[in-house]
Amino acid sequence: MNSFTKRTLTVCTGLLLGLSVSTAAWSAKTLDQVMKDRGLTQKDILAAAKTYTPTGGRDEYLAFSSGGQSGHVIVYGIPSMRILKYIAAFTPEPWQGYGYDDESKRVLYQGKLDGEIKFGDTHHPAFTETKGEYDGKYLFINDKANPRIAVIDLHDFETKQIVSSPFYKSSHGGAFVTPNSEYVMSAAQYAAPLSNDFVPLEEFNDKYRGGVTYWKFDTNKGRINEDQSFTFELPPYSQDLSDAGKNASYGWGFTNSFCSERYVGGEGRPPFEAGCSAKDTDFLHVTNWKKAAELVAAGKVKKVNGSYLITMKQAVKEGLLYLIPEPKSPHGVDVSPDGSHIIISGKLDSHAWVYSWKKIKQAIDSKNFAGKDDYGIPIIALKTALHKQVQVGLGPLHTQYDSKACTVYTSIYVDSMITKWDYCKGKVLDQIHIHYNVGHLMTMEGDSVSPDGKYLVALNKLAIDRFNPVGPLHPQNHQLIDISGDKMELLYDMPLPLGEPHYSVAIKADKLKPGVRYKSGWNSRTDSRSKYKTRAGREKIVRKDGVVHVYGTVIRSHITPEIIQVEEGETVSIHLTNLERAEDETHGFAVFNENVQLSIEPGKTASATFKADKAGVFPYYCTEFCSALHLEMQGYLLVTPKGYKAKAGKMEEGQAYSKADYDKQVKTNVDTQAVIDSVVGFITSHNYKDFPTVVALVEDATDQLGFASEAKKKAEGYAKKGDYQNATLWAGQHWQYQVKTADLGLRAKTFLEENGAVKVKK
């Protein structure tokens, strides 16, 4: 029996023994015993069954949550509540190489304001929509601290674009999407001058302003078109969240506000919170974006700060802007799926206010106004626009819609509960306590024209006693609630430990079609072929325009070139292309002391540029575990002192190899090839071409065999010369490629066996 077969049998025997032990352990305790030992009830077990997703299983929905101070977006599955990914948006993130490779640095640079910003405060994500339905193509997320919007491509879950407001100094109210993704709404938060000039607070009423921006989105290019975007100048009220009209109210946008008192605290005066909540009502802003877009297209809107600005005077003259009283200090404005009603809640109230779009539109058409504000904007009387007021609990915030007609859910901050109610009849249907102090809430596809219902997630601000203590800074608590029946049922608590999520959106998982690899040599940030694409065997080092360009490749388990030599003071630009085609075979790249960390997914080309300003030896390596010999995936950047002259001589290796060593390695290679041939026979005897995953594995395995063939020729060439040192080393490299080929083949074979592949007739 040869050594390869012995090793294979040893592994198989170990797996069988492990299986028998685990089976015995599984049967050792009954469900009743487990429940008793852990103090679980039947209700607990039912909740667990509703959220449990077996190994290899998939969630029905994916949630995309803002990451707050992290500057990221968090992706998790529902109902499993398993975190799947953090998408870097406004903050550098080394695992994804975001803000570390040249390509993503350019994306971050797009969001540069007066200086470099390495932080974002993400709040409100929104999907692109087609006819009011989530289409799963792109996601938008805002940065409150630095008024910006990021565009995330859901084909690869990467940030592609960042745009910044030329007017605002903060923007809490973004992002909100119109029903066909024509525009992304983003409102100012804290009133400030629209210029970057200093303006004293004594001129607050005259020179400080708010606003709401409609960012034009090009659905074909997947990018915001800043040249076709426009902003409404608004009074210095603190604008908050927005929503776009649907169906009956299509073409209109709704933006609420607080501190319409225009109060400024500090310097001996009572705090902002006292003066900003003195009145009984604030203002809902109603904007006609469809007509505004027509004016912009007709050249009737002037540019300020390089962007179209519709002044309050022009908006009033053209009938684009109206105000309606709303409960004071509101936090959320939510349009019903059919566009007929708008629900707003005030944080200091116990009621949710339901507005009728039909009544609002009638008032606009008949010019039925109660008066104007201090800036000349028409005000529609509350009693004219209101449909109902419903008592839902103390501190209502946000509302989400169910699949059932007229049914909604409102988060109640002070009472720490969710209220289910009927907004048509004005009747409370159910309430459930959460833990603790809920902010936003999310139903499945709850912002679309056809919400799914089924589940609700309460995005709680405080966790307190829900989880194991981890110090003074607690995680956030997202609680999953079953809303499929008449009564709400709490299912699961999920800690979120990086940043404070604000809003989340959830989409059917089958609407998402993410890729698993890029075209070879791909710049993922521009979605185009990289000019630094490198193919196997074409690696090179080129000095051009004062820069040392390294055109390299990575593949299990080596980086080419493995030695890079430059002179002290030279600028180095390393461009690496991942040659892998197999799914999930990502490589990383880090260099000692150079702040370099790349994430190079299959097919991607990523670059790192830095100045080698200090002579020395700088090891580099792959940071992503990729194969058995991952640790050997290494190299050296040698930075020679200026004027250095190499010494004569050659390196001596620590191990000498003989013909016997070479023959032994060749025997192993022959045995390994026999295993590969049997796996290939299995794959080709089945309908493997019907499985894209297997096709990719086969392509990658074929590439590996090609590399193996080249290594074999080199080994045989050295053996003919009697150089068994190099012959043995290249024969060993031949075997490394074979092992990777076998690994890919066995993965393909397993996939076929587990996914119903059938034999094909010859």
Predicted regions mapped to residue ranges:
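Bacterial N-terminal signal peptides that target proteins for export
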Residues: 2-12
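Bacterial N-terminal signal peptides
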Residues: 12-20
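Predominantly soluble domains enriched in secretory-pathway, periplasmic, or organellar proteins
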Residues: 26-541, 571, 609
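Beta-strand cores of secreted/periplasmic/IMS beta-sandwich domains, seen most often
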Residues: 75, 561-583, 604-614, 618-619, ...
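Histidine- and aromatic-enriched segments that form or immediately flank copper-ligand environments
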Residues: 161, 575-605, 628-635
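N-terminal edge beta-strand
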Residues: 541-571
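Extracellular/periplasmic metallocenter environments
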Residues: 600-655
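Amphipathic, heptad-repeat alpha-helical segments
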Residues: 655-709, 760
